[in-house]
Structures are given as structure tokens and as C-alpha cells.
């Protein structure tokens, strides 16, 4: 299972709010809610997040066994 708990941590480190992230990436509110609920998202969304936050995938996502 992929979880996105690290996303909030990375956002805090970079002092970026959810609103700013949405504006910077064009990701809608529904997708942000899906991220916070650890639901499936498209890889292009992950790419947008990593680009906007200037980070690696492991800075926003983590694999944990079910």
C-alpha cells in the first residue's frame, strides 16, 4: 500500500499551504483529499507534486505492506 503521510511533512518543511500547492500544480481539491485519504492517484499527479515541491518521490510517498 502506498501512503502519502510524508506529503504533509514535506509541505511544512517548504512552508507551502494546501492552497499554494493547488495553485502551483493545478491539482484540484478532490485529488488533494484523495492524497490525504491515501487513495490511488495518477503518476502524473505525483510528478506535479515532486516538481512543485522540488523533492523526490520518497519525500511525499511511502510503501508499507498491508
Give the positions of each predicted feature.
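Alpha-helical residues within the helix-turn-helix
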Residues: 12, 23, 51
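Residues in the helix-turn-helix
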Residues: 20, 31, 59
Amino acid at each position: 500500500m502506498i501512503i502519502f503521510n510524508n506529503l504533509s511533512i514535506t509541505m511544512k518543511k517548504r512552508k507551502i499551504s494546501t492552497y499554494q500547492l493547488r495553485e502551483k500544480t493545478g491539482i484540484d481539491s478532490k485529488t488533494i483529499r484523495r492524497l490525504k485519504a491515501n487513495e490511488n492517484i495518477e503518476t502524473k499527479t505525483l510528478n506535479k507534486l515532486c516538481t512543485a515541491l522540488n523533492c523526490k518521490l520518497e519525500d511525499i510517498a511511502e510503501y508499507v505492506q498491508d
